[in-house]
Protein backbone atom coordinates (compact mmCIF):
# COMPACT_ATOMS: atom_id res chain seq x y z
CA UNK A 1 0.00 0.00 0.00
CA UNK A 2 1.49 3.38 -1.03
CA UNK A 3 1.98 6.15 1.55
CA UNK A 4 1.40 9.90 1.02
CA UNK A 5 4.57 11.79 1.90
CA UNK A 6 3.60 15.29 0.87
CA UNK A 7 2.14 16.26 4.22
CA UNK A 8 5.32 15.36 6.14
CA UNK A 9 7.60 17.40 3.86
CA UNK A 10 5.28 20.39 4.09
CA UNK A 11 5.30 20.09 7.86
CA UNK A 12 9.14 20.10 7.91
CA UNK A 13 9.24 23.09 5.59
CA UNK A 14 6.75 24.91 7.77
CA UNK A 15 8.89 24.17 10.83
CA UNK A 16 12.00 25.57 9.11
CA UNK A 17 10.10 28.72 8.11
CA UNK A 18 8.91 29.18 11.68
CA UNK A 19 12.48 28.87 13.01
CA UNK A 20 13.74 31.30 10.36
CA UNK A 21 11.03 33.82 11.24
CA UNK A 22 11.80 33.44 14.96
CA UNK A 23 15.47 34.09 14.30
CA UNK A 24 14.65 37.16 12.18
CA UNK A 25 12.35 38.39 14.95
CA UNK A 26 15.20 38.10 17.51
CA UNK A 27 17.61 39.92 15.20
CA UNK A 28 15.03 42.66 14.71
CA UNK A 29 14.62 43.06 18.48
CA UNK A 30 18.40 43.28 18.93
CA UNK A 31 18.65 45.94 16.23
CA UNK A 32 15.83 47.93 17.87
CA UNK A 33 17.60 47.76 21.25
CA UNK A 34 20.92 48.85 19.72
CA UNK A 35 19.28 51.78 17.92
CA UNK A 36 17.58 52.85 21.15
CA UNK A 37 20.91 52.82 23.03
CA UNK A 38 22.58 54.87 20.29
CA UNK A 39 19.75 57.40 20.43
CA UNK A 40 20.23 57.77 24.20
CA UNK A 41 23.96 58.44 23.75
CA UNK A 42 23.28 60.96 20.98
CA UNK A 43 20.69 62.69 23.14
CA UNK A 44 23.23 63.10 25.96
CA UNK A 45 25.81 64.46 23.52
CA UNK A 46 23.25 66.88 22.09
CA UNK A 47 22.38 68.07 25.60
CA UNK A 48 26.04 68.75 26.40
CA UNK A 49 26.58 70.49 23.08
CA UNK A 50 23.40 72.52 23.56
CA UNK A 51 24.51 73.67 27.03
CA UNK A 52 27.96 74.51 25.67
CA UNK A 53 26.47 76.41 22.71
CA UNK A 54 23.97 78.27 24.92
CA UNK A 55 26.78 79.42 27.26
CA UNK A 56 28.83 80.67 24.30
CA UNK A 57 25.83 82.49 22.83
CA UNK A 58 25.05 84.14 26.17
CA UNK A 59 28.66 85.29 26.59
CA UNK A 60 28.72 86.57 22.99
CA UNK A 61 25.54 88.61 23.52
CA UNK A 62 26.79 90.12 26.78
CA UNK A 63 30.20 91.08 25.36
CA UNK A 64 28.91 92.53 22.06
CA UNK A 65 27.70 96.13 22.21
CA UNK A 66 26.48 98.09 19.22
CA UNK A 67 27.00 97.25 15.56
CA UNK A 68 29.95 95.04 14.64
CA UNK A 69 31.11 93.55 11.35
CA UNK A 70 30.50 89.92 10.43
CA UNK A 71 34.23 89.14 10.58
CA UNK A 72 34.53 90.66 14.04
CA UNK A 73 31.49 88.66 15.19
CA UNK A 74 32.95 85.40 13.81
CA UNK A 75 36.34 86.09 15.37
CA UNK A 76 34.76 86.87 18.74
CA UNK A 77 32.58 83.75 18.54
CA UNK A 78 35.60 81.55 17.75
CA UNK A 79 37.52 83.08 20.66
CA UNK A 80 34.60 82.44 23.04
CA UNK A 81 34.26 78.83 21.83
CA UNK A 82 37.98 78.22 22.44
CA UNK A 83 37.78 79.84 25.86
CA UNK A 84 34.74 77.70 26.75
CA UNK A 85 36.58 74.54 25.63
CA UNK A 86 39.56 75.51 27.78
CA UNK A 87 37.27 75.98 30.79
CA UNK A 88 35.69 72.56 30.27
CA UNK A 89 39.13 70.98 29.92
CA UNK A 90 40.25 72.67 33.14
CA UNK A 91 37.18 71.33 34.95
CA UNK A 92 38.03 67.79 33.81
CA UNK A 93 41.64 68.26 34.94
CA UNK A 94 40.43 69.59 38.27
CA UNK A 95 38.22 66.52 38.77
CA UNK A 96 41.13 64.21 37.94
CA UNK A 97 43.35 66.12 40.34
CA UNK A 98 40.75 65.84 43.11
CA UNK A 99 40.54 62.08 42.59
CA UNK A 100 44.33 61.81 42.77
CA UNK A 101 44.43 63.89 45.94
CA UNK A 102 41.74 61.76 47.55
CA UNK A 103 43.67 58.60 46.68
CA UNK A 104 46.87 60.15 48.04
CA UNK A 105 45.10 61.13 51.31
CA UNK A 106 43.69 57.62 51.62
CA UNK A 107 47.16 56.10 51.19
CA UNK A 108 48.64 58.51 53.73
CA UNK A 109 45.82 57.73 56.18
CA UNK A 110 46.48 54.01 55.85
CA UNK A 111 50.23 54.53 56.33
CA UNK A 112 49.59 56.65 59.42
CA UNK A 113 47.22 54.00 60.78
CA UNK A 114 49.82 51.28 60.22
CA UNK A 115 52.49 53.41 61.90
CA UNK A 116 50.28 53.95 64.96
CA UNK A 117 49.54 50.23 65.17
CA UNK A 118 53.25 49.44 64.92
CA UNK A 119 54.10 51.95 67.67
CA UNK A 120 51.42 50.45 69.95
CA UNK A 121 52.85 46.94 69.44
CA UNK A 122 56.24 47.95 70.91
CA UNK A 123 56.98 45.89 74.07
CA UNK A 124 59.90 45.95 76.48
CA UNK A 125 61.92 42.85 77.30
CA UNK A 126 60.44 42.70 80.81
CA UNK A 127 56.91 42.52 79.44
CA UNK A 128 57.94 39.70 77.13
CA UNK A 129 59.41 37.73 80.04
CA UNK A 130 56.21 38.17 82.08
CA UNK A 131 54.10 36.97 79.16
CA UNK A 132 56.36 33.92 78.72
CA UNK A 133 55.97 33.01 82.41
CA UNK A 134 52.18 33.34 82.23
CA UNK A 135 52.12 31.19 79.11
CA UNK A 136 54.15 28.49 80.93
CA UNK A 137 51.71 28.51 83.89
CA UNK A 138 48.73 28.14 81.59
CA UNK A 139 50.45 25.34 79.79
CA UNK A 140 51.07 23.41 83.07
CA UNK A 141 47.40 23.73 84.09
CA UNK A 142 46.17 22.44 80.78
CA UNK A 143 48.67 19.53 80.90
CA UNK A 144 47.11 18.26 84.13
CA UNK A 145 43.60 18.41 82.70
CA UNK A 146 44.01 16.61 79.39
CA UNK A 147 46.91 15.05 77.44
CA UNK A 148 45.30 15.74 74.07
CA UNK A 149 45.04 19.43 74.86
CA UNK A 150 48.75 19.28 75.68
CA UNK A 151 49.57 18.30 72.10
CA UNK A 152 47.33 21.01 70.69
CA UNK A 153 49.00 23.67 72.87
CA UNK A 154 52.45 22.58 71.67
CA UNK A 155 51.35 22.88 68.05
CA UNK A 156 49.87 26.35 68.64
CA UNK A 157 53.06 27.52 70.37
CA UNK A 158 55.13 26.42 67.39
CA UNK A 159 52.82 28.33 65.01
CA UNK A 160 53.03 31.61 66.98
CA UNK A 161 55.72 33.93 65.45
CA UNK A 162 58.48 35.18 67.67
CA UNK A 163 58.20 38.83 68.65
CA UNK A 164 60.98 41.01 67.26
CA UNK A 165 62.74 43.46 69.48
CA UNK A 166 62.63 47.03 68.17
CA UNK A 167 65.62 49.31 68.44
CA UNK A 168 65.29 52.78 69.94
CA UNK A 169 66.59 56.06 68.46
CA UNK A 170 70.30 56.83 68.57
CA UNK A 171 70.76 60.25 70.24
CA UNK A 172 74.23 60.67 68.68
CA UNK A 173 72.97 60.71 65.07
CA UNK A 174 73.00 64.10 63.29
CA UNK A 175 69.41 64.97 62.32
CA UNK A 176 69.98 68.57 61.22
CA UNK A 177 69.32 67.63 57.59
CA UNK A 178 65.82 66.38 58.43
CA UNK A 179 62.85 68.75 58.03
CA UNK A 180 62.04 70.58 61.25
CA UNK A 181 59.06 72.95 61.34
CA UNK A 182 60.29 74.87 64.40
CA UNK A 183 63.76 75.35 62.94
CA UNK A 184 62.36 76.47 59.58
CA UNK A 185 60.04 78.98 61.27
CA UNK A 186 62.97 80.38 63.26
CA UNK A 187 65.08 80.73 60.09
CA UNK A 188 62.22 82.46 58.27
CA UNK A 189 61.76 84.84 61.21
CA UNK A 190 65.47 85.74 61.24
CA UNK A 191 65.48 86.19 57.47
CA UNK A 192 62.50 88.55 57.69
CA UNK A 193 64.16 90.56 60.47
CA UNK A 194 67.35 90.94 58.39
CA UNK A 195 65.32 92.03 55.36
CA UNK A 196 63.46 94.67 57.38
CA UNK A 197 66.71 95.91 58.93
CA UNK A 198 68.32 96.20 55.48
CA UNK A 199 65.31 98.15 54.16
CA UNK A 200 65.46 100.53 57.14
CA UNK A 201 69.15 101.22 56.44
CA UNK A 202 68.46 101.88 52.76
CA UNK A 203 65.61 104.25 53.60
CA UNK A 204 67.91 106.08 56.00
CA UNK A 205 70.53 106.46 53.26
CA UNK A 206 67.90 107.75 50.81
CA UNK A 207 66.76 110.40 53.29
CA UNK A 208 70.30 111.83 53.73
CA UNK A 209 70.90 115.25 52.15
CA UNK A 210 73.65 115.99 49.62
CA UNK A 211 74.76 119.19 47.92
CA UNK A 212 74.69 118.93 44.12
CA UNK A 213 76.85 121.31 42.11
CA UNK A 214 75.62 121.75 38.53
CA UNK A 215 76.21 124.08 35.62
CA UNK A 216 73.58 125.43 33.25
CA UNK A 217 75.20 125.02 29.83
CA UNK A 218 74.27 127.23 26.87
CA UNK A 219 77.73 127.27 25.31
CA UNK A 220 79.31 128.49 28.52
CA UNK A 221 78.90 127.36 32.10
CA UNK A 222 76.80 129.01 34.82
CA UNK A 223 77.43 127.13 38.06
CA UNK A 224 74.81 126.73 40.77
CA UNK A 225 74.31 124.49 43.82
CA UNK A 226 71.21 122.84 45.24
CA UNK A 227 70.52 120.53 48.17
CA UNK A 228 68.76 117.27 47.43
CA UNK A 229 68.15 113.92 49.10
CA UNK A 230 69.98 110.84 47.91
CA UNK A 231 66.69 109.15 47.15
CA UNK A 232 65.50 111.95 44.83
CA UNK A 233 65.29 111.26 41.10
CA UNK A 234 66.99 113.23 38.33
CA UNK A 235 63.58 114.59 37.32
CA UNK A 236 63.02 116.01 40.82
CA UNK A 237 66.51 117.52 40.73
CA UNK A 238 65.87 119.17 37.33
CA UNK A 239 62.57 120.57 38.59
CA UNK A 240 64.33 122.26 41.50
CA UNK A 241 67.21 123.44 39.29
CA UNK A 242 64.72 124.92 36.82
CA UNK A 243 63.09 126.96 39.60
CA UNK A 244 66.52 128.43 40.46
CA UNK A 245 67.59 129.11 36.84
CA UNK A 246 64.35 130.73 35.65
CA UNK A 247 65.19 133.88 37.59
CA UNK A 248 68.34 134.51 35.54
CA UNK A 249 67.64 132.94 32.12
CA UNK A 250 64.62 134.06 30.12
CA UNK A 251 64.70 131.07 27.72
CA UNK A 252 63.92 128.78 30.67
CA UNK A 253 60.80 130.62 31.86
CA UNK A 254 58.52 128.72 29.45
CA UNK A 255 60.49 125.46 29.52
CA UNK A 256 59.40 122.32 31.34
CA UNK A 257 61.38 119.55 33.00
CA UNK A 258 60.85 117.24 30.01
CA UNK A 259 62.76 119.78 27.86
CA UNK A 260 65.87 119.60 30.06
CA UNK A 261 68.77 117.13 29.97
CA UNK A 262 71.25 116.28 32.71
CA UNK A 263 74.80 115.48 31.56
CA UNK A 264 77.22 113.96 34.06
CA UNK A 265 80.76 112.91 33.08
CA UNK A 266 79.79 113.04 29.37
CA UNK A 267 76.82 110.72 29.87
CA UNK A 268 73.16 111.69 29.35
CA UNK A 269 71.39 110.56 32.53
CA UNK A 270 67.73 109.41 32.17
CA UNK A 271 65.19 111.23 34.34
CA UNK A 272 63.94 108.11 36.16
CA UNK A 273 67.30 107.32 37.80
CA UNK A 274 68.00 108.53 41.35
CA UNK A 275 71.20 109.68 43.05
CA UNK A 276 70.90 106.62 45.31
CA UNK A 277 71.21 104.31 42.27
CA UNK A 278 74.63 105.72 41.38
CA UNK A 279 75.86 105.91 44.98
CA UNK A 280 75.10 102.26 45.69
CA UNK A 281 76.52 100.93 42.41
CA UNK A 282 79.50 103.35 42.45
CA UNK A 283 78.72 104.18 38.82
CA UNK A 284 81.37 105.72 36.59
CA UNK A 285 81.23 107.89 33.51
CA UNK A 286 83.58 108.58 30.62
CA UNK A 287 85.56 111.34 32.34
CA UNK A 288 85.11 110.59 36.05
CA UNK A 289 82.82 109.14 38.71
CA UNK A 290 79.17 110.01 38.19
CA UNK A 291 79.02 110.80 41.91
CA UNK A 292 82.11 110.99 44.02
CA UNK A 293 80.75 109.32 47.14
CA UNK A 294 82.82 106.40 48.43
CA UNK A 295 85.26 106.34 45.48
CA UNK A 296 88.10 108.43 46.92
CA UNK A 297 90.79 105.72 46.69
CA UNK A 298 90.16 104.46 43.18
CA UNK A 299 93.44 103.97 41.29
CA UNK A 300 93.88 104.02 37.50
CA UNK A 301 96.97 102.24 36.12
CA UNK A 302 98.11 103.97 32.91
CA UNK A 303 101.82 104.59 32.24
CA UNK A 304 102.16 105.29 35.96
CA UNK A 305 99.87 105.10 39.00
CA UNK A 306 97.53 108.05 39.47
CA UNK A 307 94.99 108.50 42.22
CA UNK A 308 91.59 109.92 41.34
CA UNK A 309 90.74 113.29 42.86
CA UNK A 310 87.95 113.69 45.40
CA UNK A 311 85.73 115.98 43.35
CA UNK A 312 84.22 115.06 40.00
CA UNK A 313 83.12 117.42 37.23
CA UNK A 314 79.97 119.45 37.79
CA UNK A 315 77.00 118.04 35.92
CA UNK A 316 75.51 120.08 33.10
CA UNK A 317 71.85 121.08 32.79
CA UNK A 318 71.08 121.60 29.10
CA UNK A 319 68.03 122.45 27.02
CA UNK A 320 67.22 119.59 24.67
CA UNK A 321 66.78 122.04 21.78
CA UNK A 322 70.31 123.41 22.34
CA UNK A 323 71.73 119.87 22.32
CA UNK A 324 69.99 118.98 19.05
CA UNK A 325 71.51 122.05 17.37
CA UNK A 326 75.04 121.59 18.76
CA UNK A 327 75.48 117.82 19.21
CA UNK A 328 78.12 117.77 16.43
CA UNK A 329 80.28 120.33 18.28
CA UNK A 330 82.52 119.71 21.29
CA UNK A 331 81.68 119.07 24.12
CA UNK A 332 78.21 117.84 23.08
CA UNK A 333 79.82 115.56 20.48
CA UNK A 334 81.24 113.46 23.35
CA UNK A 335 77.94 112.96 25.11
CA UNK A 336 76.14 109.61 24.84
CA UNK A 337 73.19 107.98 26.66
CA UNK A 338 73.94 106.29 29.97
CA UNK A 339 74.05 102.47 29.81
CA UNK A 340 74.26 100.73 33.22
CA UNK A 341 75.71 97.61 31.54
CA UNK A 342 78.64 99.52 30.03
CA UNK A 343 81.77 99.79 32.18
CA UNK A 344 84.29 102.64 31.98
CA UNK A 345 87.60 101.30 33.30
CA UNK A 346 89.62 104.27 32.04
CA UNK A 347 88.68 107.94 32.18
CA UNK A 348 89.13 110.01 29.02
CA UNK A 349 88.80 113.71 28.27
CA UNK A 350 88.99 113.51 24.48
UniProtKB/Swiss-Prot annotation:
Ranges where the record places region Disordered: 1-29, 104-186
Protein name (Swiss-Prot/TrEMBL): Protein FAM50A
GO CC field: nucleus
Annotated localization: Nucleus
Alphabetically ordered keywords of this record: mRNA processing, mRNA splicing, Nucleus
Protein task: Probably involved in the regulation of pre-mRNA splicing.
Keyword Nucleus among UniProt keywords: yes
Chief location: nucleus
One of the GO BP terms on file: RNA splicing
Ranges of compositional bias, category Acidic residues: 124-157
